[in-house]
């Protein structure tokens, strides 16, 4: 399932570690936003990994699950394009 991940991490070093972890699971679509196609197990693994990297007193990470119907309605304005699961380009 498409999972949109956004984050606000105060420390530059922690922010880089979070971004690198997210790159293992998906693709960056904006500076602090990633699109990841994950099953429930992968999402759990990602959340545990990210939780170990952030300071929960100052940082935040949000995970939004996007259903298949809603994923079909994804639209992009301006720079970039939406790529579905496994690199399929949705036009």
Locate each region found by the language model.
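C-terminal structural segments of small proteins and small subunits
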Residues: 52-91
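Intrinsically disordered, low-complexity sequence elements enriched in Ser/Thr/Gly/Pro
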Residues: 12-13, 25, 45, 60-63, ...
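Extended, hydrophobic alpha-helical segments
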Residues: 1-42
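A broad, low-specificity signal for short, low-complexity segments enriched in glycine/proline
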Residues: 22-26, 50-51, 71
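Short, intrinsically disordered low-complexity segments
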Residues: 30, 35-60
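Short leucine-rich amphipathic alpha-helices used at interfaces
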Residues: 14, 20-21, 46, 77, ...
